[in-house]
Structure formats: C-alpha cells, structure tokens
C-alpha cells in the first residue's frame, strides 16, 4: 500500500471524524507523511555510505553500523505511520457496513421516506453513535498505544533521541574497539526531535479527542429520560 492509497482511505474516514480528529489527520499528513516522503530521504540518504570507522578490517564497518542502527530511522517511522493509521481502517469498514445496510433497507422500501435515492446515502455523514462510537473510540485508543510503543522502542533502540557524532564499537570481526563517525549528526538530531515532537502532539490530540468523546457520551446519557 502506497501513501496515496493510505491518504484516500484516511480522507474518507476524515468526513466522519470529530473536529479534533480532523486536526490530527492534518498534522499526520502535513507534518509526518509529507515531511517523511520529501525530507527524510535527503537527511538519511547517506547514513550507511558515510558511516566511517577508523579500521580497515573487512566487515567491521557493516557490523558496527548494524549494531548501532538495527533499523533505519526512515523505515521505523514509515512502519509507525502505517501502524498508527491502521486503526482508522476499522472505522472505514464500519462506516461502509452501515451504508451497505442502509442501501439494503432502502432497496427493500423500509427507509424510503428517509432518503431520496441511494446517492444521498453515499454522501450522508455518518454520526458517531451507537456501535460506531465504540469502534471510533477503540481506534483512537490503539493509535495512542501504537504511538507510545514506537516512541519507547525508538528511545531504547537508539539510546535516546539525540544523534551522537562518534560511537564506539567492539563487535566481531573488529580487531579492537574502533571509533565510528556519523554523517551530519546535528541535522539528523533536529529532524529526529521534530518527528518525535509531532508524534507527542498526535498523542495529545488523540487523548483530547478521547476525553471529548467520553464527555459527549456521558452528557448524552444524562439527557435521556429515566
């Protein structure tokens, strides 16, 4: 699945999201997906080629690079974006199911007074209520979990969010502890901190949306007649 397909799917979900959910989707596309596609390759395009170690031992440089960068930053961020966006597919499938049921009832004549034609059913905004409320809320909950897990994995895997200029490596087949130098560490640190910060903003937006949904759910229950 390419980014265009993902955008079209999430764009469909966006029609039925809350205002906070629409802000989250905007942040996701502009500050994460577009930045990753446009700028990340320029920053990390030289990561292995310009990873220099002060040894001529065959294989030492590759082993040291694999030790300090087991997964490329770009691939990890791409995987994070895919995992974070996946829960929205649950909402998209649920909305599609609801529309299918309405079309079926319309064709049988059960709800002909509610809609003029099938096209109106297709364009109608689906309200977040009933079982769809639970699906939508669950998708946001998993988004928060995935964001937090990936931030933790990133921190553990790379020993923090700041790129070091020099790293030491004594893995086999290196003859001794060798010094290895990372290309453009400051630029990569700035980019990493930016991506992590945006990820944190997305978590805050998701938590805010969860609170909003629960408050609206509770206020709706309190208004029901006893």
UniProtKB/Swiss-Prot annotation:
Gene3D superfamilies, alphabetized: Gap junction channel protein cysteine-rich domain (1.20.1440.80)
First-listed, main subcellular location of the protein, grouped into a coarse class: membrane
Topological relation to the membrane, as annotated: Multi-pass membrane protein
Disulfide bonds: 53-180, 60-174, 64-169
Intramembrane segments: 2-13
Extracellular topological domain: 41-73, 157-189
One GO cellular component term noted in the UniProt record for this chain: gap junction
Any one GO BP annotation for this protein: gap junction-mediated intercellular transport
Localization, UniProt: Cell membrane; Cell junction, Gap junction
Molecular-function GO terms, alphabetical: calcium ion binding; gap junction channel activity; gap junction channel activity involved in cell communication by electrical coupling; identical protein binding
Keywords: Calcium, Cell junction, Cell membrane, Disulfide bond, Gap junction, Hearing, Membrane, Metal-binding, Transmembrane, Transmembrane helix
One Pfam family of this chain: Connexin
Spans traversing the lipid bilayer: 21-40, 74-94, 136-156, 190-210
Keyword Disulfide bond included in the entry's annotation: yes
Tissue expression per record: Detected in cochlea (at protein level). Detected in cochlea. Liver, kidney, intestine, lung, spleen, stomach, testis and brain, but not heart and adult skeletal muscle.
SMART domains: CNX, Connexin_CCC
Cytoplasmic-side positions: 14-20, 95-135, 211-226
Function of the molecule: Structural component of gap junctions. Gap junctions are dodecameric channels that connect the cytoplasm of adjoining cells. They are formed by the docking of two hexameric hemichannels, one from each cell membrane. Small molecules and ions diffuse from one cell to a neighboring cell via the central pore.
Family: Belongs to the connexin family. Beta-type (group I) subfamily.
Complexes and interactors: A hemichannel or connexon is composed of a hexamer of connexins. A functional gap junction is formed by the apposition of two hemichannels. Forms heteromeric channels with GJB4. Interacts with CNST.
Protein name, per record: Gap junction beta-2 protein
